[in-house]
A protein has these predicted regions:
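A beta-strand edge to alpha-helix "cap/lid" segment located at domain peripheries
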Residues: 1-30, 35-125
Length: 125
């Protein structure tokens, strides 16, 4: 894994989380490919518009911390894998999440854009 590629993908992902922290829905949307598929831990899948509207209506992110991240590059595609711990308000109630995730990023017009994300809840131990 190239340190440069990992840094680029982590920076793009940092911008995504910062947009959610700032409730900057335009910035959040801009970091996604128009073909985004976001498959939730519940198996429900959102497209880009559905996901942004869902986050805007239901969630207020308070913190997010990635762990154990790996990034593999395949030309203009990068696959990111790791874990993330998040604190948020979901439908007005505090919620903690610890997920393992897989994310697919595509480089388009010189920018890395998220095109697929799938979190899986990590069981409590």
């Amino acid at each position: 894994m190239s340190k440069s590629l990992k840094s680029e993908i982590e920076a793009a992902d940092d911008r995504r989380y910062q947009a959610m922290l700032d409730c900057d829905w335009g910035a959040l949307s801009a970091g996604f490919g128009d073909d985004l598929l976001y498959t939730h831990g519940s198996a429900l899948t959102d497209n880009k518009h559905q996901y942004v509207e869902n986050v805007k209506a239901k969630y207020r992110l308070k913190s997010a911390k990635r762990e154990d991240v790996t990034v593999r590059g395949y030309g203009d595609i990068a696959i990111m894998h790791g874990r993330v711990r998040m604190e948020m308000d979901a439908d007005g109630k505090p919620r903690s999440m610890h997920n393992c995730f897989a994310a697919v990023w595509a480089k388009r017009d010189g920018q890395w854009r998220l095109i697929h994300f799938q979190p899986t809840p990590v069981p409590a131990t």
